[in-house]
UniProtKB/Swiss-Prot annotation:
Name this polypeptide is given: Serine--tRNA ligase
Gene: serS
Stored SUPFAM superfamilies: Class II aaRS and biotin synthetases, tRNA-binding arm
Gene Ontology cellular-component terms listed: cytoplasm
Catalytic activity entry: tRNA(Ser) + L-serine + ATP = L-seryl-tRNA(Ser) + AMP + diphosphate + H(+); tRNA(Sec) + L-serine + ATP = L-seryl-tRNA(Sec) + AMP + diphosphate + H(+)
Subunit and interaction comment: Homodimer. The tRNA molecule binds across the dimer.
Positions of disulphide bridges: none
Binding site residues for L-serine: T254, A255, E256, E308, T408
Keywords linked to the UniProt accession: Aminoacyl-tRNA synthetase, ATP-binding, Cytoplasm, Ligase, Nucleotide-binding, Protein biosynthesis
Species annotation: Desulfurococcus amylolyticus (strain DSM 18924 / JCM 16383 / VKM B-2413 / 1221n)
Main location: cytoplasm
Amino acid sequence: MSWSILTLLRDNPELLKEHVKKRFMDPSLVDEAYKLDLEWRRLLSQVQELRHRHNVISRDISKLPEPERSARINEARELLSQMEELEKKLKEIEDLREEALLKLPNIVHETVPVGPDDTYNVPIRFWGKPKVWSGYIEQFMQQTERYGFKVEYELVNWKPVGHADMLEYVLRLGDTVKAGEVAGSRFYYLFDDIVFLDIALLMYAIDSLTSKGYKLVLPPYMLRHKVMSGVIDLATFKDAIYKIEGEDLYLIATAEHSLAALHAFEEIPEEELPLKYVGVSPCFRKEAGAGNRDLKGIFRVHQFHKVEQYVYAKPEESWALMEELIGNAEDLFKGLELPYRVVNIASGDLGAPAAKKYDLETWMPAQGLFREMVSCSNTTDWQSYRLKTRLVRRKGMVKEYVHTLNSTAIASTRTITSILENRQNEDGTVTVPRVLRKYLEVFNKAPRDYIHPVKRERA
């Protein structure tokens, strides 16, 4: 059974180095894995040869006369002793080899732009008519026409209020100050209409995807170390996720983690593929690398709700399914009437699991920037190798690793920030997207057409 990265390591290690270099990672990772794999195969061959000789001798011993039988018994014992010693060495090398293999990132797809960071990301399409404040025209052009796109926009002469101020000081429906006192930075209290909006967004995404045939899943919110290290590069990202003290458990940063583990250590008949799931869960993130970015508001927070798409696929179908996943996300944001662009992520910004990644970024009028709302990845067989998830081909009962894909559908708090900036009005109200209204109607107190500022109570 072949794993694409191991196959390339053995067939063309120099080409695998080029893929590692595209990610601006140390190519000596390949040298180390290649050396250990070579040594592992050498020892494995020796162990197999000794085992074969031992089996031949053991089979023939009963047929031999003395003293030849005693000599052969001693020879078999000696072979067994040598084999046990070699197997011990083999296990040591095997552990080191596996550790080295798991450090290798995925093979970069040929359509991925090469560059060290997000400044090399390439927009591939735009949708909607953004509201652009007159003071942001130049930077809007930098994010559109620079890439050869002529995007129609609506010029506004009043500067929209940022989502953080809109939430706390205009609508007065959030409180990050009190949350900071009791829980720390990047936490929040949300109230009334914003909570209804959060729930409606989740219902909207769930309704849309289950209508398309995706199986709804409420997954575990915690995973064991063995599983979490199969889903992500845990050695690199251990400071980005929360560990439960005294327990072999980690809080998930996305339902992707639990959905990837759903078929861990299983074999899936090819006729059952693709398996399409939509998971809904809270997400917990340390945001350790965020520094002082987005400290205000609820754009980058430690906890939020998210609806996630996850697919198990045949390798020959995974690239078409990646387009389906990003298409599903685009349908959701079109329904919300939030102008966006889809971006092909640069090689240095992919993260180890992804062979290719798209981000969907909505226009944020108060910032004059497109900001990430959705991340969609094809991880090919990177996760499935680590989690031992295989497909079984009907013809010849051949086994191989499945391809897995994931994509955000809706991350509620981040999507709320986009709604607050894009759908605000000069009088301080926020127009509720039409597609959400039927999900709000089930609540007697939920907003229908507009979210209004809460009137300040008199002292």
